[in-house]
C-alpha cells in the first residue's frame, strides 16, 4: 500500500486482518509504504498525501491483530522516539523515500529501524564524506530490499550490493503497483 489517507490505510489493515483470520494463502501481513516520507524523494507517491507521524498514526500503524506490519518511512521526518514506539508495538520499520544522513540512520537504527526499502532508489547515495542512507544500509547491517529488474538498479550496483551485504541481508522486491 502506497501513501494514502489514513482511512484508506485503516481499511487496508482491516482487510489484511480479515484475510489472515480466514487463512487466505500467502497473506502474512501488510507493507505500508508512506505516507510518512520526504517530499523531495516522493517517486510515485503523491506528496499531497504525506502526513506527520503522530500518536494517532502510530496507533493505526500498530493496529493489525494478525500477521506482521512493515512500515516504510523517512527517518528524518519522524520525531525522536516514534520509531522506537512503533517497534515496541511489533511493527517492522524500514527507511525509504528519504534524504536521511548516515547519522539520521544511526539514530533510527538505535530506535529499532531494521530495514531499507528498495536500496539505491529514492534515497541518499553513498559518498566518500557522506555515506548517506545507502552507506548506512551497508555499514549497519540493515536488511535491504532490492529491485532487480535492471531498470530501477544497474546490474553492477546489484552485484556490488550482493558482495557488500550477502544473501542474508538482501530481499528481492517486485515493486508491484497498479498501472499508472
Model-predicted segments: where are they?
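Conserved strand-turn element in the central/C-terminal portion of the radical SAM core barrel
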Residues: 1-6, 147-149
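Histidine/acidic-residue-rich, glycine-tolerant segments that coordinate divalent metal ions
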Residues: 5-131
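Active-site-adjacent C-terminal substructures of enzyme catalytic domains
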Residues: 104-180
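Short, well-ordered beta-to-alpha junction loops that form the rim of enzyme active sites
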Residues: 2, 35, 176
